[in-house]
């Protein structure tokens, strides 16, 4: 599989980790939708990497809400999230936002795979995290030809190695992330150079 995209984070060779890429169609061409490093044991993606440009965000379709299993990951390694987490205070938080993929139904539907979700604190998901996603899409993406984004989550930190879990619709245990991050890399064609935009 291809791993040469500029924004990809470190790949893991652990048996419990699986690297997956999803593709879509942009301007009648098959292109990458996003890539992920998925934790088969804890049932969430440690990071999701994706390109962001006007070709992907052009509003040709509406939010699909096509909640479904990821066809590239074994079902028994995914949480089932048709009805959310079933616990107050947690949302099905997208790592790749639905609003970043409105160019076609296929692009948007893939953002509703259960593997793109984490158990995200509702206040965070609907508050500062949503504002951050909007800022990246509306203010930072237009500054370059392509903005490469990595969104990540961690269920352990140096200070806290204990992992909390939450249940999916059929009782599957999924790790609850303790922290999230985004890393941005912008590419502008005239200079053919990459510039680090920042770590958020």
Model-derived features: positions:
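Domain-level detector for secreted/extracellular nuclease and nuclease-toxin modules, and
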Residues: 1-200
